[in-house]
Amino acid sequence: MRNFDLSPLYRSAIGFDRLFNALEAGQSQGNGGYPPYNVELVDENHYRIAIAVAGFAEQELEITTQDNLLIVRGAHNNEPAERTYLYQGIAERNFERKFQLAEHIQIKGAKLENGLLYIDMERIVPETLKPRRIEIK
């Protein structure tokens, strides 16, 4: 597992204020880090988000995209049962998580497996933006 320290970029980057503000805003969302998630680089052009959604059924989860924003919502459909807890360590609250997507990122699919919601993404760069080799004659 790798963690990245972005602080050296702050010292040498000029004109990227929006990018860093977006990164900081994503880290300090007001939902207290619930539910926890991982963002994985699968290979050069493929990414996967894994969100811990234990206790949510597939029909209680909603994934939408709009303007390069991925929104994942979880809402319990039923009324909470009257229970007496001696200790409650499993959160049962609804949530909304937002992820800012870079240009040319497309959602390829999602699956719910063993309490984790996996969202697979791919970066598809148009041919016009890819570097091309010019033949010298």
UniProtKB/Swiss-Prot annotation:
UniProt xrefs under Pfam families: HSP20 (PF00011)
Boundaries of every sHSP domain copy: 28-137
One of the GO BP terms on file: protein stabilization
Membrane-crossing residue ranges in chain numbering: none
Stored InterPro entries: A-crystallin/Hsp20_dom (IPR002068), ACD_IbpA/B (IPR037913), HSP20-like_chaperone (IPR008978), HSP20_IbpA (IPR023728)
GO CC annotations, alphabetized: cytoplasm
Subcellular location: Cytoplasm
Presence of the UniProt keyword Glycosyltransferase in the record: no
Subunit text: Monomer. Forms homomultimers of about 100-150 subunits at optimal growth temperatures. Conformation changes to monomers at high temperatures or high ionic concentrations.
Alphabetical list of PANTHER family matching this protein: PTHR47062, SMALL HEAT SHOCK PROTEIN IBPA
UniProt family annotation: Belongs to the small heat shock protein (HSP20) family.
Biological function: Associates with aggregated proteins, together with IbpB, to stabilize and protect them from irreversible denaturation and extensive proteolysis during heat shock and oxidative stress. Aggregated proteins bound to the IbpAB complex are more efficiently refolded and reactivated by the ATP-dependent chaperone systems ClpB and DnaK/DnaJ/GrpE. Its activity is ATP-independent.
Protein name: Small heat shock protein IbpA
